[in-house]
């Protein structure tokens, strides 16, 4: 008889979907919807497995494969257990059905990020210390190394470029100048240095209210 683990997808503190996870004969996790508890779906939702997969950082992103493996996130159920499928794109998250965790306990918007995870995501230096899993790094897409950092009350995305020329941050900065002429409400990018590397950085433009 297959062991069944039960989970809940929530929007902040509102349960949205109950679902189950079993393991097939190859030990791979398989997810099945049990019951929708709200009359809406996350934007772009097609099916449960693809929705959850899309919340996981791609392994081709620089330094992220090692970070995912370090935390036991190399399969999708491990990812859910460690990260709760949190993202700075929206307010959906996952917890075991028996868990008493609340949105205030896990929210990336409200809680401090683990600084060591941010540094590992940016430069590949992975500490052997026990780390907190409150971090947006596990769910951030893209190819080049990047990390989320707090500057006072605000959250910024730091993005590096290729190891050889580092022209990508400059290109992004220049593109933002053009965009500002065309659209006054475009996202602003600045240039800076982080650990001696040229970066582009932009302020987070989502929130708990706007995704």
Model-derived features: positions:
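Phosphate/dinucleotide-binding and metal-coordinating scaffold of catalytic cores
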Residues: 1-211
């Amino acid at each position: 008889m297959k062991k069944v683990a039960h989970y809940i997808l929530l929007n902040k503190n509102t349960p949205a979907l109950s679902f189950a996870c079993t393991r097939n004969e190859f030990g791979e996790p398989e997810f099945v919807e049990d019951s929708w508890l709200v009359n809406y779906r996350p934007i772009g939702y097609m099916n449960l497995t693809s929705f959850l997969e899309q919340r996981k950082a791609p392994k081709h992103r620089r330094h992220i494969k090692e970070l995912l493996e370090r935390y036991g996130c190399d399969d999708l159920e491990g990812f859910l257990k460690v990260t709760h499928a949190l993202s700075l794109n929206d307010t959906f998250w996952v917890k075991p059905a028996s868990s008493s965790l609340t949105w205030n306990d896990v929210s990336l918007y409200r809680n401090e990020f683990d600084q060591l995870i941010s540094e590992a995501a940016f430069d590949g230096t992975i500490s052997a210390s026990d780390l907190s899993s409150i971090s947006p790094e596990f769910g951030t897409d893209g190819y080049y190394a990047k990390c989320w950092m707090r500057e006072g009350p605000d959250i910024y995305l730091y993005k590096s470029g290729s190891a050889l020329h580092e022209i990508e941050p400059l290109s992004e900065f220049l593109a933002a100048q053009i965009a500002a002429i065309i659209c006054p409400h475009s996202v602003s990018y600045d240039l800076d240095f982080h650990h001696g590397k040229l970066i582009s950085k932009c302020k987070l433009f989502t929130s708990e209210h706007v995704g």
